[in-house]
A protein has these predicted regions:
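Structural transition elements
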Residues: 251-273
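A structural "hinge/loop" feature
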Residues: 7-8, 34, 88-99, 124, ...
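Short helix-loop capping/hinge motifs at secondary-structure junctions, enriched
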Residues: 28-34, 107-108, 146-149, 218-227, ...
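N-terminal lobe/hinge region of extracytoplasmic solute-binding protein
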Residues: 1-15, 46, 122-123
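Surface-exposed binding/hinge segments that line
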Residues: 12, 16, 23, 58-106
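Gly/Pro-rich hinge or "lid" segments in bacterial periplasmic/extracellular proteins
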Residues: 2, 93-151, 155
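Short helices/loops that flank or line small-molecule/ion binding pockets
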Residues: 33-35, 40, 165-177, 225-226
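Extracellular/periplasmic solute-recognition and catalytic clefts
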Residues: 68-70, 130-141, 157-219, 242
Length: 273
Protein backbone atom coordinates (compact mmCIF):
# COMPACT_ATOMS: atom_id res chain seq x y z
CA UNK A 1 0.00 0.00 0.00
CA UNK A 2 0.88 3.66 -0.18
CA UNK A 3 2.74 5.31 2.71
CA UNK A 4 0.70 8.21 4.13
CA UNK A 5 2.27 10.89 6.29
CA UNK A 6 0.84 11.74 9.71
CA UNK A 7 3.51 13.35 11.87
CA UNK A 8 5.67 13.74 8.77
CA UNK A 9 4.32 16.18 6.18
CA UNK A 10 6.93 15.43 3.55
CA UNK A 11 10.02 13.30 3.07
CA UNK A 12 12.77 12.56 0.58
CA UNK A 13 15.62 10.09 0.20
CA UNK A 14 19.15 10.65 -1.06
CA UNK A 15 20.17 9.04 -4.35
CA UNK A 16 22.33 6.48 -2.57
CA UNK A 17 19.48 5.56 -0.21
CA UNK A 18 21.57 6.25 2.88
CA UNK A 19 19.84 9.41 4.14
CA UNK A 20 16.12 10.07 4.53
CA UNK A 21 14.91 13.59 5.34
CA UNK A 22 11.55 14.25 7.02
CA UNK A 23 9.62 17.49 7.46
CA UNK A 24 7.72 17.25 10.75
CA UNK A 25 4.19 18.65 11.08
CA UNK A 26 4.07 21.85 13.13
CA UNK A 27 1.51 22.56 15.84
CA UNK A 28 1.43 18.98 17.18
CA UNK A 29 1.52 18.50 20.95
CA UNK A 30 2.22 15.54 23.18
CA UNK A 31 -0.36 14.47 25.73
CA UNK A 32 1.52 16.42 28.43
CA UNK A 33 1.04 19.63 26.42
CA UNK A 34 4.63 19.98 25.19
CA UNK A 35 5.34 20.63 21.49
CA UNK A 36 6.50 17.91 19.12
CA UNK A 37 9.83 18.87 17.53
CA UNK A 38 12.41 17.21 15.32
CA UNK A 39 14.52 16.54 18.41
CA UNK A 40 11.77 14.32 19.83
CA UNK A 41 11.56 12.37 16.59
CA UNK A 42 15.32 11.91 16.35
CA UNK A 43 15.65 10.76 19.95
CA UNK A 44 12.71 8.35 19.66
CA UNK A 45 14.33 6.72 16.62
CA UNK A 46 17.78 6.48 18.21
CA UNK A 47 16.26 4.98 21.36
CA UNK A 48 14.77 2.00 19.52
CA UNK A 49 17.89 -0.21 19.24
CA UNK A 50 19.00 0.83 22.73
CA UNK A 51 15.76 -0.28 24.38
CA UNK A 52 15.28 -3.39 22.24
CA UNK A 53 18.70 -4.62 23.33
CA UNK A 54 19.17 -8.29 22.44
CA UNK A 55 15.84 -8.21 20.60
CA UNK A 56 16.97 -5.49 18.20
CA UNK A 57 15.89 -6.54 14.71
CA UNK A 58 12.89 -8.52 15.92
CA UNK A 59 10.52 -5.95 14.42
CA UNK A 60 12.35 -5.50 11.13
CA UNK A 61 15.84 -4.77 9.89
CA UNK A 62 15.74 -0.96 10.00
CA UNK A 63 16.66 -0.62 13.68
CA UNK A 64 19.85 -2.64 13.08
CA UNK A 65 21.25 -0.29 10.41
CA UNK A 66 20.61 3.11 11.99
CA UNK A 67 23.80 5.17 12.05
CA UNK A 68 22.30 8.41 13.34
CA UNK A 69 19.15 10.52 13.52
CA UNK A 70 19.75 14.27 13.50
CA UNK A 71 17.45 17.26 14.00
CA UNK A 72 18.84 19.73 11.46
CA UNK A 73 16.33 22.38 12.55
CA UNK A 74 13.23 22.54 14.74
CA UNK A 75 11.06 20.58 12.30
CA UNK A 76 13.49 18.68 10.06
CA UNK A 77 14.99 15.26 10.80
CA UNK A 78 17.66 13.35 8.89
CA UNK A 79 17.87 9.58 9.30
CA UNK A 80 21.30 8.19 8.39
CA UNK A 81 21.70 4.48 7.68
CA UNK A 82 24.79 2.30 7.41
CA UNK A 83 23.47 0.92 4.12
CA UNK A 84 20.52 1.49 1.77
CA UNK A 85 17.28 -0.20 2.76
CA UNK A 86 14.20 -0.47 0.54
CA UNK A 87 11.74 -0.84 3.42
CA UNK A 88 12.73 2.24 5.44
CA UNK A 89 9.43 4.11 5.14
CA UNK A 90 7.23 1.11 5.83
CA UNK A 91 9.12 0.10 8.95
CA UNK A 92 8.99 3.65 10.28
CA UNK A 93 5.19 3.29 10.10
CA UNK A 94 5.30 0.60 12.81
CA UNK A 95 4.10 2.14 16.06
CA UNK A 96 5.98 -0.68 17.75
CA UNK A 97 8.86 0.01 17.94
CA UNK A 98 8.99 3.38 16.11
CA UNK A 99 6.28 5.27 17.99
CA UNK A 100 7.27 8.88 18.67
CA UNK A 101 7.24 10.00 22.30
CA UNK A 102 8.50 13.05 24.15
CA UNK A 103 12.30 13.13 24.42
CA UNK A 104 11.85 13.93 28.11
CA UNK A 105 10.92 10.28 28.63
CA UNK A 106 14.44 9.05 27.86
CA UNK A 107 17.55 9.13 30.02
CA UNK A 108 20.82 10.59 28.71
CA UNK A 109 21.85 7.12 27.48
CA UNK A 110 18.52 6.85 25.59
CA UNK A 111 17.14 4.16 27.87
CA UNK A 112 13.47 4.68 28.67
CA UNK A 113 12.46 6.15 32.01
CA UNK A 114 10.62 3.04 33.09
CA UNK A 115 8.51 4.60 35.84
CA UNK A 116 7.21 7.26 33.45
CA UNK A 117 6.24 4.72 30.82
CA UNK A 118 4.48 2.54 33.39
CA UNK A 119 2.31 5.36 34.70
CA UNK A 120 1.50 7.46 31.62
CA UNK A 121 1.89 7.81 27.88
CA UNK A 122 3.62 10.74 26.26
CA UNK A 123 2.59 10.33 22.64
CA UNK A 124 0.67 12.43 20.11
CA UNK A 125 -2.30 10.12 19.50
CA UNK A 126 -6.00 10.71 20.25
CA UNK A 127 -5.88 8.77 23.54
CA UNK A 128 -3.60 8.62 26.54
CA UNK A 129 -3.05 6.08 29.31
CA UNK A 130 -5.05 6.62 32.50
CA UNK A 131 -3.82 3.79 34.73
CA UNK A 132 -4.71 0.14 35.32
CA UNK A 133 -6.94 -1.89 37.60
CA UNK A 134 -4.83 -4.49 39.45
CA UNK A 135 -2.81 -5.25 36.33
CA UNK A 136 -5.86 -6.77 34.62
CA UNK A 137 -7.52 -3.79 32.95
CA UNK A 138 -5.74 -0.85 31.29
CA UNK A 139 -7.67 2.39 30.87
CA UNK A 140 -7.35 5.08 28.20
CA UNK A 141 -8.99 8.50 27.91
CA UNK A 142 -9.11 11.23 25.28
CA UNK A 143 -5.91 13.21 24.89
CA UNK A 144 -6.97 16.84 25.59
CA UNK A 145 -3.97 18.08 23.60
CA UNK A 146 -4.65 15.97 20.51
CA UNK A 147 -3.94 17.97 17.37
CA UNK A 148 -6.38 16.11 15.09
CA UNK A 149 -10.13 15.62 15.08
CA UNK A 150 -11.32 14.52 18.51
CA UNK A 151 -12.40 10.85 18.69
CA UNK A 152 -16.06 10.06 19.31
CA UNK A 153 -15.43 7.72 22.24
CA UNK A 154 -14.45 9.44 25.51
CA UNK A 155 -12.58 6.49 26.97
CA UNK A 156 -12.01 2.75 26.64
CA UNK A 157 -10.37 -0.08 28.56
CA UNK A 158 -8.35 -3.12 27.54
CA UNK A 159 -9.09 -6.13 29.75
CA UNK A 160 -6.91 -9.22 30.16
CA UNK A 161 -8.93 -12.45 30.27
CA UNK A 162 -6.72 -15.55 29.89
CA UNK A 163 -9.45 -18.18 29.44
CA UNK A 164 -11.14 -18.39 26.04
CA UNK A 165 -14.55 -19.43 27.39
CA UNK A 166 -14.41 -16.61 29.93
CA UNK A 167 -13.80 -14.14 27.09
CA UNK A 168 -16.93 -15.23 25.29
CA UNK A 169 -18.93 -15.15 28.53
CA UNK A 170 -17.65 -11.63 29.23
CA UNK A 171 -18.89 -10.48 25.84
CA UNK A 172 -22.26 -12.15 26.31
CA UNK A 173 -22.61 -10.50 29.73
CA UNK A 174 -21.75 -7.08 28.34
CA UNK A 175 -18.43 -6.81 30.19
CA UNK A 176 -16.54 -6.35 26.91
CA UNK A 177 -17.59 -5.03 23.52
CA UNK A 178 -14.84 -6.33 21.26
CA UNK A 179 -12.55 -9.37 20.99
CA UNK A 180 -9.67 -9.41 18.55
CA UNK A 181 -7.05 -11.87 17.32
CA UNK A 182 -7.03 -15.57 16.49
CA UNK A 183 -4.97 -16.15 19.64
CA UNK A 184 -7.74 -14.56 21.71
CA UNK A 185 -10.72 -16.29 20.12
CA UNK A 186 -10.83 -19.94 19.10
CA UNK A 187 -12.29 -20.99 15.76
CA UNK A 188 -15.19 -22.63 17.61
CA UNK A 189 -15.94 -19.46 19.56
CA UNK A 190 -15.72 -17.38 16.40
CA UNK A 191 -18.26 -19.62 14.66
CA UNK A 192 -20.53 -19.48 17.72
CA UNK A 193 -20.55 -15.68 17.87
CA UNK A 194 -20.92 -15.37 14.10
CA UNK A 195 -24.19 -17.31 14.29
CA UNK A 196 -25.53 -15.46 17.35
CA UNK A 197 -27.95 -12.58 16.82
CA UNK A 198 -26.68 -9.23 17.99
CA UNK A 199 -23.00 -9.95 17.37
CA UNK A 200 -20.75 -9.36 14.39
CA UNK A 201 -17.70 -11.37 13.34
CA UNK A 202 -15.10 -10.51 10.75
CA UNK A 203 -11.89 -12.00 9.37
CA UNK A 204 -9.29 -9.68 7.86
CA UNK A 205 -8.90 -10.14 4.13
CA UNK A 206 -5.13 -9.90 4.41
CA UNK A 207 -2.70 -11.29 6.96
CA UNK A 208 1.02 -10.72 7.47
CA UNK A 209 1.52 -13.73 9.74
CA UNK A 210 2.44 -17.29 8.81
CA UNK A 211 2.01 -20.18 11.23
CA UNK A 212 4.61 -22.85 10.60
CA UNK A 213 6.52 -25.79 12.07
CA UNK A 214 10.30 -25.57 11.72
CA UNK A 215 12.71 -28.50 11.62
CA UNK A 216 15.69 -28.71 13.97
CA UNK A 217 18.45 -29.30 11.43
CA UNK A 218 20.94 -30.17 14.17
CA UNK A 219 18.84 -33.27 14.91
CA UNK A 220 20.13 -36.53 13.46
CA UNK A 221 16.66 -37.34 12.16
CA UNK A 222 15.69 -33.96 10.72
CA UNK A 223 19.18 -33.41 9.35
CA UNK A 224 18.19 -35.85 6.60
CA UNK A 225 16.53 -33.96 3.74
CA UNK A 226 14.60 -37.05 2.65
CA UNK A 227 12.99 -37.28 6.10
CA UNK A 228 12.04 -33.60 6.01
CA UNK A 229 10.49 -33.98 2.56
CA UNK A 230 8.56 -37.07 3.69
CA UNK A 231 7.13 -35.32 6.75
CA UNK A 232 6.24 -32.23 4.72
CA UNK A 233 4.33 -34.42 2.26
CA UNK A 234 2.57 -36.25 5.10
CA UNK A 235 1.00 -33.11 6.56
CA UNK A 236 -2.47 -32.38 5.22
CA UNK A 237 -2.49 -28.59 5.48
CA UNK A 238 -6.02 -28.37 4.10
CA UNK A 239 -7.22 -30.57 6.96
CA UNK A 240 -5.35 -28.41 9.48
CA UNK A 241 -7.02 -25.29 8.10
CA UNK A 242 -10.49 -26.86 8.17
CA UNK A 243 -10.37 -28.90 11.38
CA UNK A 244 -8.20 -26.77 13.67
CA UNK A 245 -8.78 -23.26 12.38
CA UNK A 246 -12.36 -23.67 11.22
CA UNK A 247 -11.54 -22.72 7.63
CA UNK A 248 -10.62 -19.18 8.74
CA UNK A 249 -7.01 -19.44 7.57
CA UNK A 250 -5.50 -19.74 4.11
CA UNK A 251 -3.15 -22.63 3.41
CA UNK A 252 0.46 -21.42 3.45
CA UNK A 253 2.72 -22.76 0.73
CA UNK A 254 5.45 -20.18 1.34
CA UNK A 255 7.14 -18.94 4.50
CA UNK A 256 6.07 -15.33 3.99
CA UNK A 257 2.47 -14.24 3.51
CA UNK A 258 1.59 -13.48 -0.10
CA UNK A 259 0.06 -10.24 1.18
CA UNK A 260 3.55 -8.92 1.99
CA UNK A 261 5.34 -6.82 -0.66
CA UNK A 262 7.27 -8.92 -3.21
CA UNK A 263 6.13 -12.20 -1.63
CA UNK A 264 3.34 -13.23 -4.02
CA UNK A 265 5.55 -15.64 -5.95
CA UNK A 266 4.93 -18.99 -7.58
CA UNK A 267 7.09 -21.94 -6.61
CA UNK A 268 7.00 -25.72 -6.45
CA UNK A 269 5.58 -26.85 -3.11
CA UNK A 270 5.15 -30.16 -1.31
CA UNK A 271 1.66 -31.52 -1.80
CA UNK A 272 -0.12 -33.86 0.60
CA UNK A 273 0.78 -37.45 -0.22
Amino acid sequence: GEVVGVLAEDWSMSEDGMVSTFQIKQGVKFSDGSDLTAEDVAKSILAVPVNLGQYNGSYGRLSTIIEDAVATDEYTVELHLTQPYYNTLRELCLANPFGIVSSEQFNDDLTAKQESFRSATYGTGPYMYAGDNDGQTWNFVRNPNYWGEAPEVDSFSIKYIPDNDAKILAMQNGEVDFLSGIKNVSAESYAQMEQTDGYGAQVDEKSLQTYYVGYNLSSEIFGDQVVREAISSAIDKDAVVDNIYGGLFDKADTFFSRDLPYCDVEQTVYGFD
